Swiss-Prot record:
The gene is nuoB. It is a peripheral membrane protein. The keyword Transport applies. NDH-1 shuttles electrons from NADH, via FMN and iron-sulfur (Fe-S) centers, to quinones in the respiratory chain. The immediate electron acceptor for the enzyme in this species is believed to be a menaquinone. Couples the redox reaction to proton translocation (for every two electrons transferred, four hydrogen ions are translocated across the cytoplasmic membrane), and thus conserves the redox energy in a proton gradient. This is NADH-quinone oxidoreductase subunit B.
Length: 184
């Protein structure tokens, strides 16, 4: 006979990490960082038809200090990359990044010197969302996948080392193809 059978009804056993993960995943405040056409689909997700508020995202934060999720929606130019990194550094811990669309994930069809070939060269990305532009349903699905990832995130020192390792691996990763001018 285990401990669960001896407890009266209405008592739940859990760890602090699981409770914190549950609370954290249901109270995300995304930062508005729409850069191109994917931002239109991100705005549609906040509308009444798709209602992102049912997942705890009541409002999009205009300041990075009050946001913990950055949705990079669209292509990132070389001039915008330092601004993106500065906004990421100003966000409160814990923070997550969602790359929305092919342009944010890999540069998309814009294979030239002015566009960053994937936002993961600037900030560590937690979820990649494909599509050009991805539909609001896909953004909601990616947010649910991010909720699962947040639920499993450790706390304290374990969390800091996990984040540092993930960021270092993401920023030091080599591109999958070698770029030679505008032609491959």
């Amino acid at each position: 006979m285990g401990l669960e059978e001896q407890l009266p009804g209405g008592i739940l056993l859990s760890t602090v990490e699981k409770v914190a993960g549950y609370v954290r995943k249901n109270s995300l405040w995304p930062a508005t960082f729409g850069l191109a056409c994917c931002a239109i689909e991100m705005m549609a997700t906040a509308g009444p038809r798709f209602d992102i508020a049912r997942f705890g995202m009541e409002r999009f934060s205009a300041t990075p200090r009050q946001a913990d999720l950055m949705i990079v929606a669209g292509r990132v130019s070389q001039k915008m990359a330092p601004v993106l990194r500065q906004i990421y550094d100003q966000m409160a811990e814990p923070k997550w990044v969602l790359a929305m669309g092919v342009c944010a994930s890999s540069g998309g069809m814009f294979n030239n010197y002015a566009i960053v070939q994937g936002v993961d060269h600037v900030v560590p990305v937690d979820i990649y969302l494909p599509g050009c532009p991805p539909r609001p349903e896909m953004l909601l699905y990616a947010i649910l996948k991010l909720h699962e990832k947040i639920q499993q995130m450790p706390l304290g020192v374990n969390r800091e080392t996990a984040i540092a390792e993930a960021e270092q691996a993401a920023l030091s990763a080599r591109p999958t193809i070698e770029m030679r001018g505008l032609l491959r």
